[in-house]
Curated annotation (Swiss-Prot):
The lineage of its organism: Bacteria, Bacillati, Bacillota, Bacilli, Lactobacillales. This is tRNA(Met) cytidine acetate ligase. Catalyzes the formation of N(4)-acetylcytidine (ac(4)C) at the wobble position of elongator tRNA(Met), using acetate and ATP as substrates. First activates an acetate ion to form acetyladenylate (Ac-AMP) and then transfers the acetyl group to tRNA to form ac(4)C34. The gene is tmcAL. Belongs to the TmcAL family. ATP binds at residues 7-20, 96, 152, 175. It comes from Streptococcus thermophilus (strain ATCC BAA-250 / LMG 18311). GO terms for cellular component: cytoplasm. Keywords: ATP-binding, Cytoplasm, Ligase, Nucleotide-binding, RNA-binding, tRNA processing, tRNA-binding. Its EC number is 6.3.4.-.
């Protein structure tokens, strides 16, 4: 049977995600961000709720991306997620994209010319951001065009790069309805961004989310819930450069700006430059919030939930893969658990995120 991998955040889970799961084949394994997501912000509902949403809509197994995989630029995010899915035995990767290209051929190009392509990236001017350098690499070596705001397409290229030479078949699915960051409510499939913005509109949420009641009754958070704590962390840390990816320039810009702002987005706007993108600044603020220092990734894989098919698949790979089903009996990743502790501070109604929690089972 085909084993299909899906890399996701489900922030929150919506009809577009269900469409993706419906078009995936065989056993469907999801590698999902935990309580903080790739663009550098807390997930609107916790990882357990989002895993349950996925399992109730077609996923067979949901595993957690460690913090240092989940909150990273596209290449590192993709590489870490593909590594986990590869160890779980996937033979195909299904993903949504705004541009349906031959990603398999693109992966082959990278497999053949990776050294030359990475050398090209290194040769580009330092005032370019890493995403800009990567786009120039794909344009030059694979003839890829970039039109407008296409974050899923950029992730698709990162997946192609991560899967190169691994024997994993790439299965792109045309993104349906609104664009990734679209705020439009008059569409066939609403974006996660739009659902977060209009979360109080129950009719809108009901229309575009298969698990709308679960979402609406679950504790929710946003950056606003952590703003004061973030300001405290910036003001009281004597050496911000001890935090992952914070250099002297970023530290200086943060210290200068933090007393002049009243929201995280204002801080992002003041600190971001052409070289330091807003997404990168948000990730850095997330590292500061949770006190992240450079850390190795865990070798074991944390399971959030499974169906019966997913449970059978886990049994078939457990001899070759170190699986953690209950944190406490067995340690997993201290940084992710530290981040979860901070996440819980955002809403007093949030449940314990690790100790005593067991995988969700869906029949």
């Amino acid at each position: 049977m085909t084993v299909t991998g899906i890399i996701a955040e489900f922030n929150p889970f919506h009809n577009g995600h269900k469409y993706l799961l419906d078009h995936a084949e065989g056993i469907k394994i999801v590698a999902m961000s935990g309580n903080f997501v790739q663009r550098g912000e807390p997930a609107i509902v916790d990882k357990w709720i989002r895993a349950q949403m996925a399992l109730e809509n077609g996923a067979d197994l949901v595993v957690e991306l460690p913090f240092f995989t989940a909150v990273q630029s596209a290449d590192y995010f993709a590489s870490g997620a593909v590594d986990i899915l590869s160890r779980l035995g996937i033979d195909s990767l299904t993903f949504g994209t705004e541009e349906v290209l031959d990603y398999q051929t693109i992966a082959d190009v990278y497999s053949e010319k990776s050294e030359e392509m990475e050398a090209f990236v290194e040769s580009l001017p330092s005032d370019l951001s890493y995403p800009q350098k990567t786009q120039k690499m794909w344009e030059k070596f694979a003839g890829v065009d970039f039109t407008g705001n296409t974050p899923n397409h950029i992730l698709g290229l990162a997946y192609a790069k991560a899967c190169a030479g691994k024997g994993i078949t790439l299965n792109p699915i045309q993104r349906q309805g609104a664009g990734y960051h679209s705020l439009d409510k008059e569409v066939s499939f609403a974006s996660a961004t739009s659902l977060r913005l209009h979360k109080e509109d129950s009719n809108f949420v009901d229309k575009f989310m298969p698990n709308s009641k679960l979402f609406q009754t679950s504790p929710q958070v946003s950056w606003d819930n952590y703003f004061q704590l973030l300001v405290y962390q910036i003001l009281t840390n004597p050496d911000l450069t001890s935090v992952f990816q914070v250099n002297e320039e970023i530290a200086s810009r943060l210290k200068a700006a933090v007393r002049e702002i009243s929201s995280v987005e204002e801080l992002v706007d003041k600190v971001a430059t052409k070289r330091y993108t807003k997404a990168r600044v948000r990730r850095i603020l997330t590292y500061i919030l949770v006190g992240a220092v450079d850390n190795s990734l865990p070798k074991s894989i944390h399971v959030l939930g499974f169906s019966q098919k997913g449970q059978f698949h886990l049994k078939s790979v457990k001899k070759s893969v170190d699986i953690v089903a209950r944190i406490g009996r067995k340690p997993w990743d201290m940084l992710t658990q530290q981040a979860d502790n901070v996440y819980q501070l955002g809403n007093p109604e949030l449940c314990e995120q690790n100790f005593g929690r067991v995988p969700i089972r869906v029949k």
